[in-house]
Amino acid sequence: VPEIKGIAYCVGSIDLKPLRMITEQDFNKCMKLNLYSAVEAIKGYQESLKKNNGSIVLFSTVAAQRGFTNHTIIASAKAAVEGLTVSLAAEFAPNIRVNCIAPSLTKSKIAEPMLKNTTIAEGIAKAHPLKRLGEGKDSASLAKFLITEDSSWVTGQIIAVDGGRSK
């Protein structure tokens, strides 16, 4: 296992369905991608992170705490990631810091199918107090800060990067 000082675990999915259409397989797939694989990655690098006073940054979604129509699958999985964040922050302190970024919809390849419809994209942008969609750099800048020693007094936090949508 290589020596590392930080992990930014940036996986995600957008599987939007009403409850009546959700299957157990939908939940299992989303949990495997967003939670179980994060746990395995962290376990694989835990000793190196501990030795190097490292930092872990996980990713959630504003939907985990705010709630949106048809977001049951992803909101549930990302709420589990938030629980993992605060639990591991307590378990790994003082040697490893663990934080989580909870973005709102961000312009990305994963969101392209939804954002191709300009009416939908504009409507979602208007729902944010800052009246725009997020950019990857919005979350990346925060992740960079959380990985570095500049954030050495920050652990166990779920930080919204959502243009004000969560408030």
Please state what every model-predicted region is.
Residues 18-19, 26-28, 124:
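Substrate-binding pocket helix/loop in short-chain dehydrogenase/reductase
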Residues 42, 77:
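Active-site helix of classical SDR
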Residues 61:
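Residue(s) in the substrate-gating loop at a strand-loop-helix junction
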Residues 66, 144, 155-167:
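Short C-terminal tail/terminal secondary-structure segment
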Residues 102-113:
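Short, flexible catalytic-loop segment of classical short-chain dehydrogenase/reductase
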Residues 128-139:
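A conserved structural motif in NAD(P)-dependent oxidoreductases
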